Amino acid sequence: LDETQATLLNAGRYHASHGLLRIELRHQLRDSGHGVREDLLEAVLTVRNASDRPQRVEIGFGTSLRPGGAGGAQQVYLPLSAAGLFGDGRFAALGVRGFLKDCNQPVAAGEFACHYLEPMASQPAERETRALLLAPVVDVFDSRQPWRVALFTPSDEPARFSAVTRTPLFGGPGGADKAGQTTWRASRCVTVAAGSAHTQRCWLLLHEGDAAVAWRAFQQFAHREEFDVPGWVREMKVHYYDFLSSAEGGEGRRGDGYEGDLPRFREFRVGLATQHGYYPAIGDFIQPDRKTWQAMRGDKRGAAAMSFGKMRARIQATRAAGAKAAIYMHAALFDDAAPCFDRLRECVQVDASGQRMDFGWTGPDTAGKTWRASLGSAEWRAHLLQQAGWIMDILRPDAIVMDETFAGLGYDHHAGRTGPTSAGAIDFYRRLRALVRSFGADKAFFTSDCSMSPFVLWADGECGDHAYPGLLGQALYTQAPVRYLAALGGKPWRPCAWHFQQMWPAQMKLARQVGAGVGVSNGWLEYTGLTRLPAETKAAMLADIQTLFDARG
């Protein structure tokens, strides 16, 4: 808003009117639990609309508090999406080519802006950002000073954070201060319905230490955890992922690789085993009346026969081997060879030019062309929830692993649902977790954010495949404090890794650094599985895996 249209409130002026809007600001000091009493200030702004029509309002919280005083060199540590590390084209609509990579950024004269969730979700006129955040937290510091200032907002609401620095024409006393005044602001636009009210919160934290301190405060005060993470999820360290592999390796016919690796589960201390590639067409994973089917219909060696019986037998054998069993789903991939595609074709996401968005995946599990379905579509969300319900009811696994959950970030230009998709995605992941948990308190739902989105906030942990040179292989990916921990919090990180041998040193580095697990796999990119590993490689891996359990003890 133009400053002439703004209504400013502070500790001395805590209520006001703006036309037919009634505005009230309340502050409360809190103890974040980090050893400094009353180090957290919570601000609550309530806007009441007394008019007879909806009102669009921009709500912002600002502070000129800065570490190090007016003459300090200000920096900010941001939990940036890792999509910028390799320019992931799936984030093109958000401006991925210009994404910042280093979480540590200087704050210079002018405006520095960053966004949590899609920019348009907090500021309707903005489409792209240079800094896409994994959590709505900015941590401001001066490297010469111990104290930091952090701003954060609720986990399920979009936010735009900005710093405006104005350099004065003249310095301070003696000409020493020419750094100018910096104001940090957290804001978003909301529509307040006629006769209703909207409440917005923001927190200001003073702390020592690094940004991880602010992230923990965010998790404690600005995020509501709806379920406890099952104990077994924290205990397991090794995640096995099977892409309906072959027991004969890369040149064999798919379908029996899982059974070939099962006898090695105890030896490798596998704690979770995920079945992937089992479906006839991605997006149409399971149907109650389809008890047998052909999977991997795009594989050059021929399709693989699958059935409920085979999947259940794998689940039982996995448990007998001391592991938990998970079933794969995907948040957005939709194969137009699926019988349900014609009924659900309007669920496909539409880009800014009005074209349906293809996902660009062609693999052994595809029978037709793959499209990007939209989590902004209520019909698609209902379809996936129904699929998940059938999986849990018919197969009775211990968990569902949802692939590429970051597909929930973006814009859908389909008529009738135009706008950001993250609100629908958050609602969907919340409902999916609740559905899975309805089958037992020990059932779990895992995301695959791959450090590119924040949806693990509404899951039991992260199982995404990040074992690529462009992600896990980048030094900035594990820059301390590791960016994804802002969203992950204290939940388990148990990745998938198709490049599990190639990326093993990087996997172990992260595991030792932050307590993550490691991934082993079969059926994609590497085809040895657990059974055909070279003896020297196997021995080294087993020794490394043992250290993960030794460290835990």
Predicted regions, residues:
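Active-site-proximal substrate-binding groove within the catalytic cores of carbohydrate-active enzymes
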Residues: G195-T199, T421-G553
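Polysaccharide-binding surfaces and accessory modules of carbohydrate-active proteins
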Residues: Q5-H18, I23-R160
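Active-site groove signature of glycoside hydrolases
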Residues: G271-Y279, H383-T418
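An acidic-aromatic substrate-binding cleft motif
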Residues: R201, L205-Q287, K291
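Hydrophobic faces of well-ordered beta-strands that scaffold small-molecule active sites
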Residues: M236-Y241, A273-Q275, A325-Y328, I400-M402, ...
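Active-site-adjacent "subsite" loops/lids of carbohydrate-active enzymes
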Residues: Y240, L244, G249-R254, A304, ...
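Beta-strand-rich recognition/accessory modules
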Residues: R37, A50, G60-G62, E111-R234, ...
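Aromatic- and acidic-residue-enriched carbohydrate-binding clefts of CAZyme catalytic domains
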Residues: Y278-F308, P339-L375, F406-D427, L432
